[in-house]
Amino acid sequence: MRLGRLGVEDVYDENYKFEFGKGNVLRKGSKVAIIASGLMVQESLKAYELLESKPTVIDIPTIKPIDKELIIETAKTHDVIVTVEEHNIYGGLGSAVSEVLAPEGIACRQYMLGMRDVFGRSGKPKELLDYYGLDAKHIKELIIEL
């Protein structure tokens, strides 16, 4: 599922320079880190604003190559990593993060928020985000449960 029909707000200022293969820490928090890409970065930042206990929010603009150093450092300094993607959780961003951490022997709890290997349905983008639990409200609720 891709909801590219929605306009995505710019999360960077005019001085930002894209660096291929490098992720960016957009908000610094503790205990929980949210790693997202694309539209899900915007929803993750909205969830950040709704939460009292602030998570770290990381934008991973490229999945291949992925920023291994940032992911490893994040896993070492947080209790839980939550990946958020408008994609099947199998073979997506969450899997890529797991593939970075497993060979390093880093034991960090991970939760993958995304499509659970189901056929997508049609609808308005915001309604689909809500239906699949990918909007800021659902991200916030998941973080509180962790």
Task: Give residue spans per PLM region.
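Thiamine diphosphate
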Residues: 4-146
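Active-site donor-nucleotide binding/catalytic segment of nucleotide-sugar enzymes
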Residues: 1
